[in-house]
């Protein structure tokens, strides 16, 4: 499929070249192959790549969760070698790369890692900010505010790579111990990463079915699956969050974590390498072992009981995002500098 996309873009580029178009600079995400042959059309153009991730057979994420290990471990390195061929085909043509986090940049081979600048896409901290009087309408419960005990959990798709199974398995105890809590879960039913569920099923429903019998009807009524939300509504969700839970394999760091921190949320997160770039334990959030659902719930409940700690962690989290990830003050100027350096280098 990558070659098919590359060929289609090559033909479109040739048509543009024949009309006199000649770019000085090409910026591309190489992951789907569109940029494979562009410098064959425009040999003098500089090519900069968005380096999201280089897949390695034994690190960082593929063998992380034994419950969802590869069914064919002997051939997994072969599959990944083929998957990475696209990266290697780009390395020779590219002049430089940019990665949003050190963790992602460090997955790349050293020969190309030396050409990668770490610069995040950036968070608009003027939009993602604390808002004391915010209200969020949730079907079945009316308006929720910061006066309510709201626990939030966000995935693009509800799946094991982002710890959905760990969170769901911890729900029965959380609902039992926190009788006033509302749990707001954001995410779709598909798969973004990792193994697909059995035919005709979704990870969302599989883990609902696993825990549903442990949760009384009245408690289950306090769990709200919101699907995907428009961005403004999503920010309001983060702004009312009393504790935000973020779980992920050692993988691409979710923008939603940084947005939650920018909104001043108190975060409980998995203690994995990409998360540790932004969360220092008990400074900008609290870290727990990814697989330890009991510790996760203890950390959540402890923060729900400690308003002073929540305020301190949320204040520190927002300060870190503003200092290192602010779109307009930090990241966009660095991106412009990177483009200028690429163009003139």
Q: What feature does the model see in each segment?
A:
Residues 1, 44-85, 126, 130-131, ...:
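Acceptor-binding helix/loop patch of EC 2.4 sugar-transfer enzymes
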Residues 3-4, 308-344:
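A charged, aromatic-enriched C-terminal amphipathic alpha-helix characteristic of glycosyltransferases
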Residues 56, 68-148:
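Donor nucleotide-sugar binding/catalytic pocket of nucleotide-sugar-dependent glycosyltransferases
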Residues 137-162, 168-173, 183-184:
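Conserved donor-binding/catalytic core segment of Leloir-type glycosyltransferases
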Residues 191, 195-228:
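Nucleotide-activated donor-binding/catalytic signature segment of Leloir-type glycosyltransferases, i.e.
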Residues 249:
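Aromatic "clamp/platform" in nucleotide-sugar-dependent glycosyltransferases that forms part
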Residues 266-269, 279:
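Short hydrophobic beta-strand element within catalytic cores of glycosyltransferases
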Residues 281-282, 286-293, 302-308:
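Conserved acidic donor-binding segment of nucleotide-sugar-dependent glycosyltransferases
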């Amino acid at each position: 499929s990558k070659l098919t996309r590359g060929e289609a873009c090559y033909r479109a580029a040739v048509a543009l070249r024949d009309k006199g178009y000649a770019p000085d600079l090409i910026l591309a995400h190489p992951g789907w192959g569109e940029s494979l042959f562009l410098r064959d059309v425009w040999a003098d153009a500089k090519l900069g790549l968005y380096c999201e991730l280089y897949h390695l057979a034994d690190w960082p994420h593929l063998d992380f969760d034994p419950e969802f290990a590869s069914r064919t471990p002997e051939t997994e390195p072969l599959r990944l070698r083929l998957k990475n061929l696209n990266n290697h085909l780009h390395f020779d043509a590219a002049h430089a790369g940019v990665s949003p986090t050190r963790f992602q940049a460090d997955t790349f081979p050293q020969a190309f890692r030396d050409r990668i600048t770490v610069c995040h896409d950036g968070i608009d901290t003027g939009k993602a900010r604390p808002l004391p009087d915010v209200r969020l309408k949730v079907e079945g419960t009316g308006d929720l505010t910061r006066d309510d005990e709201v626990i939030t959990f966000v995935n693009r798709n509800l799946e094991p790579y982002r710890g959905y199974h760990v969170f769901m398995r911890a729900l029965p105890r959380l609902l039992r111990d926190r009788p006033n809590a509302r749990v707001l879960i954001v995410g779709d039913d598909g798969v973004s990463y990792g193994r697909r569920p059995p035919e005709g099923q979704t990870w969302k429903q599989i883990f609902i079915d696993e825990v549903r019998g442990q949760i009384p009807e009245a408690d289950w009524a306090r769990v709200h699956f919101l699907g995907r939300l428009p961005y403004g509504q999503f920010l309001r969700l983060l702004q009312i969050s009393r504790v935000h839970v973020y779980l992920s394999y050692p993988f691409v760091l979710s923008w939603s974590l940084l947005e939650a921190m920018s909104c001043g949320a108190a975060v409980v997160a998995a203690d994995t390498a990409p998360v540790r770039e932004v969360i220092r334990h008990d400074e900008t959030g609290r870290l727990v072992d990814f697989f330890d659902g009991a510790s996760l719930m203890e950390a959540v409940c402890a923060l729900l009981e400690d308003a002073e700690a929540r305020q301190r962690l949320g204040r520190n989290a927002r300060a870190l995002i503003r200092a290192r990830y602010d779109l307009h003050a930090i990241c966009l100027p660095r991106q412009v500098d990177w483009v200028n350096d690429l163009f003139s280098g």
